[in-house]
Swiss-Prot record:
It comes from the Bacteria. PANTHER family: UPF0397 PROTEIN BC_2624-RELATED (PTHR37815), UPF0397 PROTEIN SPR0429 (PTHR37815:SF3). The chain crosses the membrane at residues 11-31, 44-64, 74-94, 118-138, 149-169. It is a multi-pass membrane protein. Pfam families: ECF-ribofla_trS. The lineage of its organism: Bacteria, Bacillati, Bacillota, Bacilli, Bacillales. This is UPF0397 protein BPUM_3679. The keyword RNA-binding does not apply.
């Protein structure tokens, strides 16, 4: 990385973010009835971190977090690990447009966030994950596309609801620029 390195704050966010992703993925997920496919709250947290720290942090939190989660359960499933990184990366690309650090996360920004996260999740779970499952693991197409569609839809909804609430709550803790005025005596 000639010239541009990650800040200490971002590196710490990646470490903590990956750890929280693992914990949420292991202990706060809901089975769907489709084999190896859960409703994951970890993607709402990944969206928050990607929005706050950008695409590199989002990609690394998703990738490292999913890798550790899989490694501590049934073993790494690389196609889905890669997609978690891709989803974090793509959501992170809008961090500069959303600027939630400035205390504003109104309807226009909520709409932009949800359009991007839904597009990122759809690309990742409806296309990339199933195709990689077929290429890497020779899994049957009908099985992996059903898993991808269920995972994608549940992640879109989870991030759309829980992710939006978390980001909006975070934005409310920030002072809007120009919201403070000097008192005259």
């Amino acid at each position: 990385m000639a010239g541009k390195q990650l800040s200490t704050k971002t590196v710490v966010a990646i470490g903590i973010g990956a750890a929280v992703f693992v914990i949420l993925g292991r202990f706060v997920s809901i089975p769907t009835g489709i084999p190896n496919t859960q409703i994951e709250t970890s993607y709402a947290f990944l969206a928050l971190m990607a929005v706050l720290f950008g695409p590199v942090a989002g990609a690394l939190i998703g990738f490292i977090g999913h890798l550790i989660k899989d490694a501590t359960t049934f073993g790494p499933w690389w196609s889905w690990i890669i997609v978690s990184g891709v989803v974090g990366l793509l959501i992170g690309f809008i961090s500069n447009r959303l600027k939630v650090e400035e205390g504003d996360f109104g309807w226009k920004k909520i709409t932009l966030f949800n359009a991007v996260q839904a597009g990122a999740q759809a690309l990742g779970w409806f296309v990339i994950a199933p195709v990689l499952d077929i290429v890497i693991y020779a899994e049957p197409a009908n099985k992996v596309f059903v898993q991808g569609i269920v995972a994608g839809i549940s992640n879109i909804i989870t991030v759309g609801v829980l992710g939006t609430i978390i980001i909006a709550a975070y934005a409310k803790t920030r002072s809007k620029s120009g919201s403070l005025s000097k008192e005259t005596s």
